[in-house]
Amino acid sequence: MQIHTTIQSLRAARAAVSGKVALVPTMGNLHDGHIALMRQATGHADSIVASIFVNRLQFGPRDDFDRYPRTFKADCERLEAAGVAHVFAPDEGEMYPQPQQYHVDPAPAHVTILEGEFRPDHFRGVATVVLKLLNIVRPDVALFGKKDYQQLMVLTNMVRELAVAVEVVPGETIRATDGLALSSRNGYLSAEERVEAPRLYRELARVRDAVRDGDRDFLKLETEAVAGLAAHGWHPDYIAVRRRADLQPPGDANDPLVVLAAAKLGHTRLIDNLEI
């Protein structure tokens, strides 16, 4: 496995690769969900590139940029074991040698709702760095996890509307045996909070099952789920049933749906979703 810290080095290595290339962007602090994406990528390409870059642009003033764990050595060991051929790990000066003046501004309808309401400019930062990574690596395939469902929707639309020559492949959410979605932020939970954390999944599953059984009173289901979390010390930001395609409120009864949630448990904000 080769580790590249400069754009020039990565591009030279990319030029020497024959066959299909897959990119899996990460911010490091890898868990089994990331590794599942790497293994999934092997089914779509001959060579896998994983990026490790903690992107300041997608962190808000109250987010945890400085607190985000950096575990580079352990990450590289896991990536090599998963069959990754190249790691692109630039520092901030390499990715942003001067303050970034050009950005990708996603459609307001996609980024002022749900996560966008609570994290202004987050998706602007995500879309900007991902487009930059796609331009650097020039992969045939890029993989993103469904756990960040709104991010996946934004990036899929960005790639389509900007005619980027890459196939976006979604990866299923990987969960602990108790249902908690794997996330780098789970490490912030105390022992007691970790026991409580799967309740977020259970509330989502309850909404999903009710809708599958024919309940179309989405507001009632959302309100009950919020109350169920709040009764156990959570501080929910939202639980919402939305259309998968654009995360707008459901319309036609045949629209494929997803239920999404974000809530704070102690000092840790968790997000999750389930397709219906």
Curated annotation (Swiss-Prot):
Pathway, per record: Cofactor biosynthesis; (R)-pantothenate biosynthesis; (R)-pantothenate from (R)-pantoate and beta-alanine: step 1/1
The EC number(s) this enzyme carries: 6.3.2.1
Gene Ontology annotations of biological process type: pantothenate biosynthetic process
Binding site residues for beta-alanine: Q58
Active site per UniProt: H34
Annotated catalysed reactions: (R)-pantoate + beta-alanine + ATP = (R)-pantothenate + AMP + diphosphate + H(+)
GO MF entry, a single one: pantoate-beta-alanine ligase activity
Record key words, sorted: ATP-binding, Cytoplasm, Ligase, Nucleotide-binding, Pantothenate biosynthesis
Entries under Pfam families matching the protein: Pantoate_ligase
Additional remarks: The reaction proceeds by a bi uni uni bi ping pong mechanism.
Family listed: Belongs to the pantothenate synthetase family.
Described function: Catalyzes the condensation of pantoate with beta-alanine in an ATP-dependent reaction via a pantoyl-adenylate intermediate.
Quaternary structure annotation from Swiss-Prot or TrEMBL: Homodimer.
Protein name: Pantothenate synthetase
Lineage: Bacteria, Pseudomonadati, Pseudomonadota, Betaproteobacteria, Rhodocyclales
